[in-house]
Design a protein with these regions (language model features):
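Aromatic-anchored transmembrane helix interface
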Residues: 36-47, 62-117, 137
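Hydrophobic transmembrane alpha-helices and their immediate junctions
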Residues: 67, 319-360, 380-386
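Long extracytoplasmic/lumenal interhelical loops at the membrane interface
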Residues: 266-320
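Membrane-interfacial loop-to-transmembrane alpha-helix junctions, especially the N-terminal start
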Residues: 4-15, 58-72, 124-133, 184-186, ...
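N-terminal signal-anchor transmembrane segment
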Residues: 1-55, 72-87, 140-148
Length: 402
């Protein structure tokens, strides 16, 4: 890899700034001038890439659907800021900033434009993604242990906690399948990631990891020679066995993990069902025609319930109404089509399907569309850029990644 060409490229600087921004509280104070400057840089690059993609490239349907999402959340986000209404998460008595809606959606969606454009212009390649896989894992570990330390410091009674970073680890899977062609490396890294997913004790992340493992096994048995099929099957069996053994270890040695398993078997969803019931009751019995069509505004679920819906479909329906649901359904229609369409590059198809599994499953039991980690969107933009025909627009030519 040519260091002068790749390490100091704008795409890599963007990632480094993103890492620095998400280390606020460790490297510098929360919401400091420096952190705001970092976020401003991210927004500047992201919106420039949004503009550049729309002006210079013939966009695939997936990117057009992302355009619709960005327009929708921008309108509702601006209205949220303009309204300046103070909303509280009653479950922990914390106020939600009026800018949080836009910040979360922008941090989640806009990096797709960055990776799409820089892939088209040759800055992001398969080798570059391979270079970043290990920093992604290291940074996820920093997030994991940082979260654990914070939870221990703020709670003197409990010694074990659920850790949302399990979702972050799981989002690195598509990058592994793009960056590494050797099967044994893929499976070792996948195993390492899944150990952290299980340790996080997030039931949704564990469920997604099981579905992902099933897909990885099926994919390894397709379109390969007999010898490769046996190797893939053997690696999959070892991977499942390793996950099972670690699951057993956690079950026997972690009281919290034991409780989480029992709650799952009993159908206890950590009050999520109660929130869903309250929001569904509102939509059926109390919502006006206007609110059914256009919603009650960004963060609207906090006006009805004591916390966010933790379900994209309910959250969007309450906040943005049927117009939001229609846009979101269209987004998923083209996402599925993008992931399932024939591709000459199997690793891109595998990465897209793993990304699709991760994001779609998460819509039902966690916030998904406004919480996609950059490890996922970085690869998602790359895959979409390389999963389209090589077209030019307004004399701008782009090149296929290595």
């Amino acid at each position: 890899m040519n260091l002068s060409k790749h390490v100091f490229s704008i795409s890599n600087v963007y990632l480094l700034v993103w890492f620095a921004y998400h280390l606020q509280g460790c490297l510098f104070s929360l919401n400091s001038t420096l952190s705001q400057a970092f976020w401003g840089f991210q927004l500047l690059v992201s919106f420039y890439c949004l503009y550049y993609a729309n002006k210079h490239f013939v966009l695939p349907k997936y990117m057009k659907a992302v355009n619709l999402l960005v327009c929708l959340v921008t309108i509702y986000g601006i209205l949220r800021v303009a309204g300046a209404e103070i909303l509280i998460i009653k479950e922990n008595d914390s106020a939600v900033a009026t800018t949080d809606f836009l910040r979360h959606y922008y941090n989640s969606i806009l990096p797709i434009y960055v990776s799409f454009v820089f892939t088209k212009t040759g800055q992001i390649t398969e080798r570059v993604i391979k270079f970043w896989v290990f920093p992604f894992i290291v940074f996820a570990m920093i997030e994991y242990y940082g979260t654990q330390s914070y939870l221990l410091a703020t709670n003197t009674i409990q010694q074990e906690f659920t850790n949302n970073t399990g979702y972050v680890f799981l989002s690195i899977l598509p990058a592994i399948f793009i960056g590494f062609r050797k099967l044994w490396i893929r499976y070792i890294l996948t195993m390492f990631i899944l150990l952290y997913v299980i340790s996080s004790m997030k039931r949704g992340a564990i469920l997604i990891s099981i579905i992902s493992l099933i897909y990885i096994t099926i994919s390894g048995l397709k379109n390969r020679g007999i010898l490769f099929k046996f190797i893939a099957l053997g690696c999959s069996i070892l991977l499942f066995y390793g996950v099972y053994e670690y699951f057993q270890y956690m079950f026997e040695n972690s009281e919290m993990f034991n409780i989480r398993v029992q709650e799952t078997l009993e159908g206890n969803s950590s009050s999520r069902d109660k929130i869903a019931g309250v929001l569904s009751d509102y939509l059926i019995n109390d919502a006006t025609i206007w609110s059914l069509l256009f919603g009650i505004g960004a963060d609207g679920t906090l006006k009805i319930s004591w916390n966010f819906a933790h379900n994209d479909w309910l959250e969007i329906m309450v906040d943005m109404g049927l117009i939001g649901i229609i846009v979101y359904m269209y987004y998923w229609k083209v996402f599925f089509a993008e992931a399932l369409k024939p591709s000459n590059d199997k690793k891109i198809k595998d990465a897209l399907i793993l990304a699709c599994i991760y994001c779609f499953c998460r819509t039902f039991f966690s916030q998904s569309i406004d919480a996609m980690p950059i490890y996922l969107t970085y690869v998602l933009g790359y895959c979409v850029a390389n999963n389209t025909k090589h077209e030019t627009n307004k004399n701008i030519t782009y090149h296929k990644s290595n």
